[in-house]
Amino acid sequence: EIALNLAAKDVRIQAPIPGKSTIGIELPNKVNSAVSFREILSKLPAPSDKTILAVGLGKDIMGTVKWAEINATPHLLIAGATGSGKSVCINCVIASILMRARPDEVKLVMVDPKKVELSMYNGVPHLLTPVVTDPKKASIALKNIVVEMERRYQVFEDTKCKNITAYNKMCETNTDYVKMPYIVFIIDELADLMLVAAKDVEDSIMRITQTARAAGIHLIVATQRPSTDVITGVVKANIPSRISFAVSSSIDSRTILDQTGAEKLLGKGDMLFKPMGENVPIRIQGAFVSDEELQKIVDYTISQQKANYDHSLTEDKSGSENGDNTKYDDGYESKEEYDDPLYNDIVDFAMEFGKISASLIQRKYRIGYNRAARIVDLLEERGIIGPQNGSKPREVLIKKEASNDSDE
């Protein structure tokens, strides 16, 4: 009756308004006011250790700028029907990170099964690997991120650090270790991944969302099919922070937010944001960023630094059928056959420095951890360095002349 008497498109009632003894009745304006991404970006807090992953969302009904801190979220589920503003929201999140964080501070992994939504970001130095468009490779990338998470926790245990913040602070005074970047893993369409390898994807998402927060790894999952076969109980239970755009039914709204309301949204960026720990979602008009603005951001970011990809992230490291050998880069089947263009330079560096570690190689040659670790394995296999001794760098066992003889 309220909608009828006011000739409104739709009415959303909030009873009661949190913190007040009143009931809220939300009426949509006849003409939507655009929310500029540039304005939202200018109102975000200055980048720091705590706010490096603050991303702009939009404005609430009072005109207050709203953002989300991904490292506090710590994972995010985004859902909504086609054309509701989901893709624009993802672009705002990515653009916020590109404009506020250096590539050595935050790394991105993007999965885009549709091949057109995120492909424009190829070449950005923040990318850990080129935008993944193959659902099978995306499933492998998720598994390898779990491996990276476990590696980080092993380093934290060796260095007696509780989380990535404490570890990076320790690296400022201990030059034997290199700082770790945050990793934000963005999946643009979860449904396509669930069709290919539902069990593997669900298991990896569960592992990451349950334990990866302290390791600085965060997951952003988006889907336009908010059904229970895509947003399963496991996914929902481990991703408490959610954003819902306009959906077609109250059932879909309950699937995303555990309550109705999203079916009454207007579309075009109108969203309900339910952060972790909050029972009542916040209604936000999402910021709009055009394709031209995004292209300018991408071009500017690429002009600052070239991308340095780690292609091993999308390689299956489970090994061959007998489980003895691992497939290395360039098609080699074992450490004995594998070689690296930087191998001789790294040997010379080790001779001069007297010790070596994967972290030192990372910092010196600006390569990924997996590649650095394989080179360390190769050096040990050839008797150039000693075995691992806890978290300390490895000792160099032979002199430069001996190394040259062995290479010959």
Task: Tell what function each PLM region has.
Residues 3-5, 15-26, 34, 39-162, ...:
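P-loop NTPase catalytic phosphate-binding loop
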Residues 275-322:
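Phosphate-sensing "switch" segment of ASCE/P-loop ATPases
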Residues 8, 217, 367:
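Short glycine/serine/threonine/alanine-rich loop segments
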Residues 23-27, 297, 394-396:
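Generic detector of short, aliphatic-rich beta-strand segments that form the cores of beta-sheets
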Residues 162-167, 316-320:
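A glycine-rich phosphate-binding loop feature that marks nucleotide/adenosyl-phosphate handling sites
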Residues 308, 315-408:
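Terminal-proximal interaction/regulatory segments of ATP-powered molecular machines
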